[in-house]
Amino acid sequence: MNSNKIQEQIENNRRSVSFDSYDITVRQLFDMIQEGLIDIAPEYQRHFVWDEVRQSQLIESLILGIPVPNLFMATNKDSSWEVIDGLQRLTTIVNFLGDEQLIKKTNANGIKLKLKGLEKLDTLNNSFFEDLPKSVQLMFMTRPVRVTVLNDRSDFELRYDLFERLNTGGVTLHPQEIRNCVYLGKFKDFLQECAENQDFLDVVKMTKNAERTGNREELVLKFFSYYEDRELFVHSVKEFLNDYMAKKTESFPEQTAYKSLFEETFARLKQLLPQGIVRGNRTNITPLVLFEAISIATADIITDENQQILDSQKLQDVLNNAELTKLTTGATNSRNKLTQRINFVKEHLA
């Protein structure tokens, strides 16, 4: 084991972590959520997994002054806080203290918490917050919770890494779901808008679960990143997409042009491929690498100054071409394979 190489690797991978720590009372946290100063990430509603007993145990711990795990936040550019780790605890506090409107705003499936399953404070079972003695209410509201806040001087890559490592809500998050929480701004909103485009939805077939976990937005992200920067792609798709999204979050002057390109690409594909980007008898699912090859090749052709006429029959034929099948199966995550797939489609549409 080479200690110098180990030290060098550590130094090369260290990034500036800039954070602040606070002790904030339950009441202050609740007020900040009400006022929109803490974003519990409504895109993560499906990830609230605690049942009433688990929620009640947190309330019991706070009343008794038993330490609870730190909350971890990231500061946005508008100085609001985004939850990285602590969704379950904060949503529980809202369910216990909030009215129906706030509870539904925070978690569409949320209901007012009635304490149950408590062992140490079993006299509080079947109680809402409003049923507690005033002294117990005050005790609960003034309990401090440690909050660590990653400030906005920390880079996007660090935020992504921390969210991926620290989010322990009990449900594995899709990488795009994490991006939607880390890379906030105009470009993220643009991706979500494109993902609702009806022509895109008609052309790209995916399961309901894939739609719920951010796959649609990731396909849109792949479309633009491979269209613009595929020469920068090496092997790791996740890192490539993260880098591209970070770049566009900082500056996105191409929004109008890219919106037009996206709409024209998928309008043409819907016209040319009425059944969508599908292969053989599997008409209910779009293979991801086939999506990349067909959509990027089509976009390239549309933006080519010597634009050729796209032919429906040629496009249908290329979908089921045996050579393209070889290029879209097996080890496909390399720049060479990506380029080959796209060029193959373009050449066969000529």
Where are these regions (language model features)?
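Glycine-rich phosphate-binding segment of PLP-dependent enzymes
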Residues: M32-D39
